[in-house]
């Protein structure tokens, strides 16, 4: 029986692994569908698509149910076979032992030992099989996690100290080309941004504006060319030193499920409480924070869900004001807020940007018309460059 059980376990685990991969993929698809439905429920309701979206979600639940049932059905025959072999083993061994005892070939002590061995052996075998099945399912999950962890990290081997401001531009892109996989999104882009100046990036969506900001922040590395800060290639600078020089206000703000105070203080963890309050005042968010149930000690929901979009944006600006980095990137900072909040945010941005080097990504004219230089980016290339008056006088996208 032991030999048969061994081969049953080997064969069943192969089937378990194959079905586990399928079930894991469907579980991920269901999670995405649920998140998509919940986050987009307002849009779906506005466009009268709740029925269609609900049907898609129901379909995902049905597929998950089907895959789970198929997984359990794939295990049932092996479990039945295992129990059958264990049962037959007991049925054969016990009568044989009694027969041998009756013939005087087994002592009573040995007979009791055999009976106890039979009952104690097959129980752990069944338990071991169940645990092996669970481990196989976990192995399928770990394979997917390991695939993510196996992705190459950005190398952080820079050892050069970042110099203080000198004759070199604060920021320079030199013949930069970048691609997401096979899709090239920037091609031979070059520009400079001097200290305490404002450079605006405009152009059609998908043209590569946000990619420029992400490359400067070193979320990715360029495929060709160089990104320099004060004359140093950012790949040669320790990543922590580079991050100390840059603050970024994102279009889509994320706040952590923590107190308002801690969400602002992460801009500079050694800041005093009064410095955090002052940053909040400059970001025009002190008053509404004090109206929250516990003021700065109020725990906000995941992602800042308990606050409006404008309130979240002002808290993120307070975080940047507290950090006081010399280079500020504004990525469509007022693109998705209402008019009332926009005026507060513009005041907060004015406080943030004083004495700073600015890289601004925007669609609205009033945001960038006073920029020292405006670059128009289309399909990954700079197609126009100049200040507002110069570009208005030219024929082109601007």
For each predicted feature, which ranges?
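Pre-NBD coupling/linker segments of ABC/ABC-like ATPases
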Residues: 153-166, 391
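Cytosolic ends of transmembrane helices, especially the final helix of ABC transmembrane type-1 domains
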Residues: 49, 73, 121-148
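Hydrophobic alpha-helical membrane-associated segments
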Residues: 4-15, 42, 93, 120, ...
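A hydrophobic transmembrane-helix motif
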Residues: 1-13, 69-115
């Amino acid at each position: 029986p032991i030999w048969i059980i061994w081969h049953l376990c080997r064969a069943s685990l192969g089937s378990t692994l194959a079905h586990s991969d399928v079930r894991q993929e469907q579980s991920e698809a269901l999670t995405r569908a649920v998140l998509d439905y919940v986050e987009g429920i307002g849009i779906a309701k506005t466009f009268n698509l709740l029925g269609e979206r609900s049907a898609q979600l129901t379909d995902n639940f049905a597929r998950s149910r089907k895959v789970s049932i198929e997984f359990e059905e794939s295990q049932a025959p092996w479990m039945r076979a295992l129990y059958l072999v264990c049962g037959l083993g007991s049925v054969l061994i016990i009568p044989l032992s009694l027969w041998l005892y009756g013939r005087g070939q087994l002592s009573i002590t040995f007979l009791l030992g055999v009976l106890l061995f039979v009952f104690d052996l097959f129980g752990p075998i069944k338990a071991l099989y169940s645990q092996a099945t669970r481990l196989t399912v976990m192995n399928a999950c770990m394979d997917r996690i390991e695939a993510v962890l196996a992705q190459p990290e950005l190398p952080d081997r820079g050892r050069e100290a970042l110099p203080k401001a000198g004759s070199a531009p604060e920021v320079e892109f030199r013949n930069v080309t970048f691609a997401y996989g096979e899709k090239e999104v920037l091609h031979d882009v070059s520009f400079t941004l001097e200290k305490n100046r404002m450079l605006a990036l405009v152009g059609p969506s998908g043209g590569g504006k946000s990619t420029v900001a992400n490359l400067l922040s070193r979320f990715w590395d360029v495929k060709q060319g160089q990104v320099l800060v004060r004359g140093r290639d950012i790949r040669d600078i320790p990543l922590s030193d580079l991050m100390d020089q840059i603050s970024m206000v994102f279009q889509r703000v994320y706040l952590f499920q923590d107190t308002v105070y801690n969400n602002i203080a992460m801009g500079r963890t050694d800041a005093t409480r009064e410095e955090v309050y002052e940053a909040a005042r400059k970001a025009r968010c002190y008053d509404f924070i004090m109206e929250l149930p516990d003021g700065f000690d109020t725990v906000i929901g995941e992602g800042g869900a308990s606050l409006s979009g404008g309130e979240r944006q002002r808290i993120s600006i307070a975080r940047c004001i507290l950090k006081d980095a010399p280079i500020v990137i504004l990525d469509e900072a007022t693109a998705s807020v209402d008019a009332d909040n926009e005026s507060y945010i513009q005041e907060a941005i004015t406080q943030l940007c004083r004495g700073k080097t600015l890289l601004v990504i925007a669609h609205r004219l009033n945001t960038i018309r006073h920029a020292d230089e405006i670059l128009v980016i289309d399909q990954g290339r700079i197609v126009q460059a100049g200040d507002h008056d110069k570009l208005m006088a030219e024929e082109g996208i601007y």
